[in-house]
């Protein structure tokens, strides 16, 4: 079934000339769908299952692309993070996070064009439910646990620092506060992280996790007590339909 998706999602000129005869009749092409430049998924069945699901028995399917996680363990007890919030940081409720993602998506469209520099790059914009679905899928569990979760992110509002922000969700079964979108100046990262840790502590989480932390913030990881490693679950995987070699394509902001 996954092999057939390529024949629905990709543009016709990027697919093989003939549909594999042994698979029976090809799937129906759906209006306004079959112009994809790429498709992505997150694998929880290892790196090879979806890789073998190509558009023919001989072509690759979705290939794992960037599965690094940076994790900060959360100690028990109250947090002093509130000392930063007043006047310098603004807490975001769900509506505030949604408004931020809308603005962010507009800005990212311009940023990706600049970042490409003649190479091929793409980004999945954080709107049209790309990020909000993660909140929705966890809200049901949070409600069952009696957790009144109101802080979905934080944004700097102090002069030139207004571009620094993070949004997150709670993955209750794994006791993780998961960063879903991050854009932060290096000088403010420790404060922002402390605010996130404070929210995690408030709701009994064991860790804060960020996927593929930006290179600009890597130097701050050790100082803040974080550990970076490769995941063996939730593996971001890419199938590129363009003429370029997939290994030459940059997936920007490969976040949660």
Positions of predicted regions on the chain:
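Conserved acetyl-CoA-binding loop-helix of GNAT-fold acetyltransferases
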Residues: 1-29, 52, 186-201
